[in-house]
Design a protein with these regions (language model features):
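Active-site nucleotide/adenylate-binding loops and adjacent lid/helix of ATP-dependent enzymes
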Residues: 2-8, 72-75, 83-146
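ATP-binding N-terminal substructure of ATP-dependent carboxylate-amine bond-forming enzymes
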Residues: 1-84, 93
Length: 146
């Protein structure tokens, strides 16, 4: 029987639903708070009880990212893999990845100093939206209309 482990740092409806659905489908399932996990560079898969498949559901980008890296290093099958988190958690890398695959996206400028950001704004005009490379939920996003 396949064992699924849902790892979270805040239980929301989705984590409960994933756990409940796995149980209803006849899978062995567990749910673990990532904040209580400790792993070291000598940790072995056989000593950790994460089952066959780990569904990484951390809200904290960096907690989830590095937990995925550790679990993958030990050979666990992780859904929401390190590489996906690394790419999708970084707006610059996401934009470059989408452009490389010819996925249509809004024109995006990357500035590496405040001065170069101002130069881009002066060149392109208004409105503009300034965003940090890392971040979610609208934190640090500044729409500038004029």
């Amino acid at each position: 029987m396949v064992e699924v482990c849902v790892v979270y740092d805040k239980v929301r409806f989705e984590e409960k639903a994933l756990y409940d659905t796995a149980k209803k489908k006849g899978l062995k399932a567990q749910i673990i708070d990532a904040k209580k996990i400790t792993i070291n560079n000598a940790s072995k898969r056989k000593t950790l009880q994460f089952g066959d498949v780990v569904l990484q559901r951390c809200i904290s980008h960096f907690r989830g990212l590095y937990l995925s890296a550790c679990l993958e290093f030990m050979g666990f099958m992780v859904i929401n893999k390190f590489k996906v988190g690394e790419t999708c958690g970084n707006k610059l890398i996401t934009s470059l990845t989408l452009a490389k695959s010819n996925v249509p996206t809004p024109k995006t400028h990357f500035a590496f100093s405040a001065e170069s950001a101002i130069e881009v704004i002066n060149t392109t005009g208004f409105p503009v939206v300034l965003k940090p490379i890392i971040g979610s939920w609208g934190r640090g996003v500044f729409p500038i209309r004029d």
